Amino acid sequence: MAAAAFCCMTMTVVFTACSDDDSNKPGGDAPKTTYKYLHYADARDNMSAEESSQYKAYCWRLERKDKLQEPKNWRTCQGELTPNEESELFPDPDYEPSLEGLRQLNISGSSDLSAKELDWVKAEIEKLTDGPIYIIDVRGESHGLINGLHVSRYGANNWGNVGKTHAQIVAEEAAEIHAIKGQTIDIYSLSKNDNYQPTESGRSVTEATSAQTEEEACTERGLGYARFTVPDRAFPGDSELEAFVEFVQKLPANAWLHFHCQAGAGRTTQYMIFYDMMRNLSVPLKDIAYRQCLLGGNYLLYDGSAPGEDPVKAELCAEKAQMIPLFYQYIQENFPTGYKTKWSQWKRQFSDK
């Protein structure tokens, strides 16, 4: 069902992937590419109610237990660059990426966070900076903290909010979380083996004595918070990208950003790459993508073409592999003007290619 629904957004032009070399020329000519995926994010953001109904969330999903511990996929830009399963996808496996500007990036990443994991992250970052700390939440799906547990509303493809605006998502999420307090709810541990369907063995009956949005939990701890609503495994919509560019421009020089999505792999890496792009204009995209992967993230220039790849994942990978280099080109060309030309306006020049 999910694969069929996603394919319905396919445009009628043919995709030609940009080469690894062409995508990494700072300020160079645009890759000679047919931009099949130019408007895919727009199509997701504007999906009709009928189309999006098949992704409707159907249960509360347990994601992080409330333990004082290092969260999954925790890393900073001061960490070691280590080969991993994702780096096996590198087209140039012997390439050593530049470290230029990397160690000076005040950013970190991880999975989502329980209340005590949020405390752990705050304490760790405070060892590294005396500046303001911002939690950068790049999840499109509704989530929050119940009794300190990190939970989310889960639907097919983890796209429970696809087609909704940023404002809708944030408002509905807060209402759902606050309505739980004092109630008894079922929270499920979901498994890939069960196709992420709720099972009796995975059910936990929970009396919600406390219920907070993530923003409320951050504010309570003196942390800044910013939300960019991006569907799982997807490239961001225009409004979310433009909001991020504007947000970064207004940050204090000594700010530290901690990015997270659900697992701390795809969307987290994507936004760490975006930040790296904006702060290190002289570094080729290839180096940025490789080093963010070797720090512990995903390799996001992978085009999904491996034999036997899941078709939905393959399409989403191909989208990112095409659109991330284009966004890199946007950053290169528009930094000198302070991004006066918005991303949505700039990319129109490629609509007829």
What residue ranges belong to the model's regions?
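Bacterial N-terminal signal peptides
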Residues: A3-V14
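Cys-dependent protein tyrosine phosphatase-like superfamily
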Residues: C18-H258, Q270-K353
